[in-house]
Amino acid sequence: MTVGVLDAFLVTWSRARAAFGDGAPQDGSAYDQSPALLELQAEVAGGGPGQHWRGPGSDAYGQANDKQTAVLGEAARLDAQLRAEVDKSAEVVAAGRRELDGVRQWMLDAASEVPRTAEGERMLYPVVSRGSGEIVEILERAVADMHSISTRIGGIGAEYHALSGDLELGTGDGGGQAQIPLPSADKPMNTRG
């Protein structure tokens, strides 16, 4: 094989390949708790006031229970979306690696066909130029794909944040905190059963 232009290409290729890291790309399974959230959603939905509890307390509890059920369902949906986006990012990495490996192999095959002379070196210039262009295209495509994924993950994060604002622990005046009734002069507590 010729030395020089091919070596320069391989250095460029190695740097591009390093951008995709080593090892198996992590999929999104670690971020997806949707099965557990959906199970919890079903349990919470089953804990509503039902037909045997009536009145204002029942209505308030039922509304809070419905809201909690909806929040759990939304959290499950967001978890599944996050997993899908992380899976997509892993595929971008895997595809980039495959494509770069293909370009490298194509380059090595082409280099093996030219004579090991100055003329052979000159014959490699357009081949190296094309291979380098393909490396640039692979990197640009991966960056664009990762940017799109990042934007969507940011949107999912914003939805998670908005979802946390939908949770309340109680309906008292304590900013959503449960209130414990205290006796006062105008409202003594009834201690007799």
State where each predicted segment sits.
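Intrinsically disordered, low-complexity extracellular "stalk/linker" tracts enriched in Gly/Pro/Ser/Thr
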Residues: 1-9, 155-193
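Short, solvent-exposed coil/turn linker segments
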Residues: 21, 27, 95, 184-191
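Intrinsic-disorder/low-complexity coil detector
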Residues: 24, 34-35, 48, 180-187
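Short, charge-rich amphipathic alpha-helices with coiled-coil/heptad character
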Residues: 1-24, 54-55, 68-83
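Amphipathic alpha-helical hairpins/coiled-coils and adjacent low-complexity
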Residues: 28, 32-47, 51, 58-172
